[in-house]
Amino acid sequence: MKPIKVRNGIPFYYDKSDSEFRMDVYEQYDTTVLKNARRYLSGNRVSESLNYLVNCIRQNDESTVIVENGCGIGYHTAMISKEFGDALIFGFDLSYQMLSMAADLWIHKKKSTNGTLTAFFQKHGLSLDVEMLDQTPKMQLALAKCEKLPLENEMVDISYSCYLWDRIMDSKNFVLEQHRILRTGGYLIVLGPMSFTNKTAWETWYPFAKLVAFVQDLGFKLIDQSSWQEKDVFDGRNNHIAWQVEGFCFEKV
């Protein structure tokens, strides 16, 4: 599919309006993008979510095309690419600033970006994991809605999202789109703290048996459900938020 436009190397498959840019907190570089980088790129970074993804993907007989929905700054996209080096990895997000950071870090290797991050990390008593950034993953980044991806039917083996479910506005069409792009036997992996911010979401998805039933009714079966605690470290003194993360691995039937 041909993109609507390309901005600094990032193809757009969704025509994001000026007002949408202004209203999107994930387009705020200082308050959101840098904090997202702090979560994943310091020596104190989270790792259990990555471990869960890798373990689930390894269980699938074929993992040659992998999609991350809501890839942010590309940490999981890059690490999955490193782990499964022969696979084609797509990272989609609706934030241009997040995608731009991901491209600068993993594809363009911009030293100025590393310098900005180093200064930000040092301000909080942390250090940037420069060695990790030496990776050169094989991944493609694009701005797109996860409910309408620029991919052909049944071309994907693994589709996953991290810390996204409680932010999706249209969960039904999100799951239906994952069902469309996944081959039969492909995996849909969803994980996150499920920290819902309104009464309706809590009533809809919690307890999690409701979420599982919802996804299964749309053409999947649950093959794994796990939970773990993950620290989001703020500074060099290890001040942090402890997230209670839930992970689900579904197979398309």
Model-derived features with residue positions:
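N-terminal auxiliary segments of SAM/dcSAM-dependent transferases
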Residues: 1-24
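Conserved alpha-helix/loop element of class I SAM-dependent methyltransferases that forms part
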Residues: 42-62, 75, 79
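Conserved class I S-adenosyl-L-methionine
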Residues: 63-72, 90
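Conserved SAM/SAH-binding beta-strand->alpha-helix loop
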Residues: 95
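S-adenosyl-L-methionine
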Residues: 107-144
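A short acidic, Gly/Pro-enriched loop at the edge of an enzyme's catalytic core
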Residues: 144-159
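A short glycine-rich, Lys/Arg-flanked "PGG" loop and its adjoining helix->strand segment in the class I
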Residues: 172-184
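Conserved beta-strand signature within the Rossmann-like core of class I S-adenosyl-L-methionine
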Residues: 185-193
